[in-house]
Swiss-Prot record:
Localisation per UniProt entry: Cytoplasm
Keywords linked to the UniProt accession: ATP-binding, Cytoplasm, Decarboxylase, Gluconeogenesis, Lyase, Manganese, Metal-binding, Nucleotide-binding
Binding site for substrate: R60, Y194, K200, R324
Residue numbers binding Mn(2+): K200, H219, D258
Cofactor binding, per record: Binds 1 Mn(2+) ion per subunit.
Listed name of the protein: Phosphoenolpyruvate carboxykinase (ATP)
Amino acid sequence: MNFGRVNPAQTLDAQGITGLGEVHYNLIEPALVEAAVKRGEGRLGRGGAFLCSTGAFTGRSPKDKFVVRTPSVEDTIWWENNAPMDPEAFDRLHADMLEHMKGRTYFVQDLFAGADPELRLDVRMVTELAWHGLFIRHMLRRPERTELDSFVPEWTVINCPSFKADPARHGCRTDTVITLNFDKKLILIANTEYAGENKKSVFTLLNYILPGKGVMAMHCSANHAIGNTDDAAVFFGLSGTGKTTLSADPSRTLIGDDEHGWSDKGTFNFEGGCYAKTINLSPEAEPEIYATTSKFATVVENMVYNEETLELDFDDDSLTANTRCAYPLEYISNASATGMGGHPKNVIMLTCDAFGVLPPIARLTPAQAMYHFLSGFTSKVAGTERGVTEPQPTFSTCFGAPFMPRRPEVYGKLLQEKITSLGATCWLVNTGWTGGAYGTGKRMPIKATRALLTAALDGSLANVTFRKDPNFGFEVPTELHGVDSSLLDPRSTWADPAAYDAQAKKLVEMFANNFAQYVPYIDADVKAAAIG
């Protein structure tokens, strides 16, 4: 039995998904919240937020992610980074999932992936959980109700948490699986309730399709000057580097916080919402994100709360440190209504250096920018993972290796071409440690980071004196009004300069060892910019 609004020629039955129980098409937020609460999927929290738990899976399962290996993608997928699945195994998985789904209730959302009407993808999300429908309705971009009458899905994502895969029969690693089939334009997700798999599977899809059209796909946040979309900036960065925090600048308009494209026309958000970390969130540090946790239909995921008062505990990580909330962009007061901006004038690459070596900001040449983009460096510190007792380097190419189906140099060359042809200024910003490594030094003051970023974005930083860093070769400002000059020379902040030199040498060697894998694929300029 069908409910809701849908193109009558594009029902699930028309797609060969038959025998289901109730199918709810394109329910709006109040109806999805109502259904989720009625079905016992979670609770209504303060202000009407939806409080839920994702069970055993509180994060993504990257080792259970597959791409179906067919002749059409054989030569374009980065197989060293993307596990292959046989087409026959996929077909068995698909058939078994459809059989499992019969008689059950499902929720369908027809949505746009991408703010640019010329480049967006029409995506259908089929979810077993009502709150997953609510989540993806926040995360992607919602058509007008009248547009649903003619909506034709190009891609379909089926998410069935109650289905357990069989590794022997389905060609996967465990009973959890996320697999993309580019020939059938179909994504299957099984045995995980973690909502992030929904959005990241679509992101992976766009990261394959758009570069084939000459569009750079980016794991980054983006903003632009208020009233001037041509003064845009993008912020690349891995988890914990400050991507969301630093792009949420009250003096600038937020385009988006996580996934963007860079076309011949400029930047555009892939999404229509935000998926923010909430652990240790405070109203003082991030008031707007904090406020969303008590707004109607915000999805609050894996947060501990008082059973009587429903008050959230932002510091409790007993379920997971990866507590999150998902909400529409319009819940942020200075968010862009269009999700589009001009070409970035500034490209910022964020890193959290727990070795205490990198300066708080450095200016990069286009070749150096490609080097650091391909490197994708940040660091894990003690306590973030079991067994980590000292800083460990993390190199995640393109600042998002798990979501990159193509080889890294494809994205690197696209970025280098756009930076060079459009004259963007590139910066490396370290939000990590200074005055020593983690455990000895201190965290880079957020006030100093914001001051340096503001000066970079408004152009005033270009007017100060720069020095060439002897270890990395990039340019570092020697002073900026309002910023302690000693911070700009990391070596001077260490009690023992010789210890700094030894640590810097160690980090340079780590960069060089990691980058060796890309040397056969890069041009002479990038080779010359390589360190070590």
